[in-house]
Amino acid sequence: MRKKRIEERPSVQQLEKELSRIKYKSRYRTVLKSTVYTLITVAAVAVLVATLWLPVLQIYGSSMTPTLQDGQIVFSVKTSEFAPGDVVAFYYNNKILIKRVIAGPADWVNMDADGTVYVNSEKLEEPYVNELAYGETNIEFPYQVPDGRIFVMGDHRATSVDSRNTAVGCVSQEQLVGKVIFRIWPLEEMGFLNR
């Protein structure tokens, strides 16, 4: 005769424990999926905001010293409204340059040999410039800004290549990335940029 194997039935406590383990595993997976989807959504929104509305830019070079230093990181805001004194970012030869708006369309810009700037025959007050300089200039002053363009200059006039040079020239609306408004790095200098 064959021996019949008798299987032991699990107790109620064992069944409840196994059911609890399975439910926990299911809840864990649900929470994990939800967290991953949330992180992906937040990352996608952050990328869209950073590229479409608030581009984040790193400063390279010394053309905007003392306002902006090499290695600093700033936010810019996409806008079509720019006024003299605003710091703007724009595309130039597959790079992004950052300069200060000096004059708008149809304005007359003049500069004397010492580096003092005049817009529409009025001396431009520039507290953001430490040292005036004529800099690298190959345009003829007085210069009238063409329609639909803005005249920009770096704050460190001796080293900046800007609208004073035909290589860069005046900046068109299509070239503009946005207005630089906020410094985020280094942390001890975090804050809004002054005009």
Q: What function would you assign to each model-found segment?
A:
Residues 99-110, 114:
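RNA pseudouridine synthases
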